[in-house]
């Protein structure tokens, strides 16, 4: 079982919060597409013997790609890998790209799940984030996707934006729930240095919300979405029954995945590979970076990903994979969190209750082996 990821780095406009690798040089799209086909051929042995169960186009803005280009990549991959049992093929999309004709083309290309970057239903907030669309366009995009036959749609929201909590956040939550999507990703804003928000913060013109506001907004999101029937199954992810994100689960559960495209990462459980974060270098065939994970690295990776999910750490599995001594040390470090209720042990698993996910980074850091 494995996942296949395609990174489409191109954007028409750079969002104020985004620190993913991206490029506005749309004239290079054809060159990157050709290089992605080349990389598929070069790395066909990476997934040999594996069944590809999920495929994902992320970015960037993958919805800038024509359906024919997406279909070409999927067909090429199917010639090299066993994709016959692929249960989920996702495309990240901006609302203003999703016309009726484009959506029909996506369906014909084999896309069966859309991840729509709504972020907010407040137009002033969207302007602050330098998003291309309006709230009305977001609503229209989801409705158009549903009319086109998409029955598995996830919508992205961002909270923790200074000045846009309270009623603004409530409008966004009510708005997304009114659309009848099956999955919602709600991310807390992180102000990264190499972003427009980060540069404004360095000049004293922008300040992240404080911890009290973060917790209040996190709980507002959690309480509102779970009350509407969504399961809070990972730090930033909520799903109706049967609609968890299968591809993202490959990251959280250590499943092997191959990343194709500029800045794409691959992981096989023991080694991590990453492509050049440069369109020009990628097109030129720059070699991938590589890191061989030590046993300690693999343990920390397991702790980090497992504690982001509602299932948490399987204590028996952890002992078998990493040794009883390592597990005992981790449980010693976990004792204060268990006493406070931040961590719980039930049915052989140690996990954070979803309402405590906001502090997961602090807990994970404390349990790391240094």
Model regions and ranges:
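C-terminal scaffold of the Radical SAM
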Residues: 1, 22-45, 50-324
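Immediate flanking context of iron-sulfur cluster ligation sites
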Residues: 1-8
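Local cysteine-cluster metal-coordination motifs and their immediate loop/turn environment
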Residues: 9-20
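Short amphipathic alpha-helical interaction segments
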Residues: 323-338
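A short, conserved structural fragment
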Residues: 338-348
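Minor-groove-contacting beta-hairpin "wing" of winged helix-turn-helix DNA-binding domains
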Residues: 349-353
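Short, amphipathic alpha-helical interaction segments positioned at domain boundaries
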Residues: 355-370
């Amino acid at each position: 079982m494995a996942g296949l990821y395609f990174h489409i780095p191109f954007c028409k406009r750079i969002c104020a919060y985004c620190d993913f690798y991206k490029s506005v040089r749309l004239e290079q799209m054809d060159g990157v597409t050709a290089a992605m086909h080349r990389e598929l051929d070069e790395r066909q042995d990476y997934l040999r013997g594996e069944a590809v169960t999920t495929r994902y186009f992320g970015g960037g803005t993958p919805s800038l790609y024509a359906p024919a280009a997406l279909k070409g990549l999927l067909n090429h991959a199917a010639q090299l890998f066993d994709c016959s049992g692929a249960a989920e093929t996702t495309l990240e999309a901006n609302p203003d790209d999703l016309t009726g004709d484009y959506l029909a083309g996506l369906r014909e290309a084999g896309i069966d799940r859309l991840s729509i970057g709504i972020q907010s239903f407040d137009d002033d907030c969207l302007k602050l984030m330098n998003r291309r669309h309006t709230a009305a366009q977001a609503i229209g995009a989801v409705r158009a996707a549903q009319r086109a036959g998409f029955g598995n749609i996830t919508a992205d929201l961002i909270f923790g934006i200074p000045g846009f909590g309270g009623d603004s956040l409530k409008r966004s939550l009510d708005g997304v729930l009114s659309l009848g999507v099956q999955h919602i990703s709600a991310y807390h804003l992180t102000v990264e240095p190499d972003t427009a928000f980060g540069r404004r913060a360095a000049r004293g013109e922008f300040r992240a919300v404080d911890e009290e506001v973060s917790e209040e907004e996190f709980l507002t999101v959690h309480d509102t979405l779970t009350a509407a029937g969504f399961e809070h199954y990972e730090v930033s992810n909520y799903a109706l029954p049967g609609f968890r994100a299968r591809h993202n689960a490959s990251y959280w559960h250590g499943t092997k995945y191959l990343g194709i495209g500029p800045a794409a990462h691959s992981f096989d459980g023991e080694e991590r590979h990453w492509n050049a974060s440069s369109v020009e270098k990628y097109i030129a065939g720059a070699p991938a970076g590589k890191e061989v994970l030590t046993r300690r690295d693999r343990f920390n990776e397991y702790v980090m990903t497992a504690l982001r999910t509602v299932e948490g750490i399987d204590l028996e599995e952890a002992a078998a994979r990493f040794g009883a001594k390592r597990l005992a040390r981790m449980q010693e470090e976990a004792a204060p969190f268990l006493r406070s209720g931040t961590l719980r042990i039930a049915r052989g698993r140690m996990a954070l209750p979803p309402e405590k996910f906001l502090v997961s980074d602090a807990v994970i850091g404390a349990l790391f082996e240094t």
